[in-house]
Amino acid sequence: MNCLFCAIVNGDIPSKKVYEDEKCYAFLDIAPQAPVHCLVVPKEHIASANDISEENSAVVAHIFTAIPKIAKALGLVNGYRIVSNIGDDGCQSVKHLHFHILGGEKLSDKMA
């Protein structure tokens, strides 16, 4: 498998790590869309939210318990947005499930 995020998790490609535990890895986005923009990925390869199953759903639940810790460590005390793009029409550029944490300023209310 040739997956960019798997290579980052494995340390084959450098990243600016902000959090890591046994199930997930978070790093700063290389093209930030907000003053603070990081990605949280499961260490296990899951292609997208369409591939979440009974067998791997605990990893996704774990990520959502890690996100508040990551946001706090990034100084996002006034709020943040979590985004996940799914599939081509959803503009998913890397086929490895990931969640964007965006914040650091008042975000536009036009997205959701």
Residue ranges and their predicted role:
Residues M1-A112:
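HIT superfamily nucleotide-processing domains
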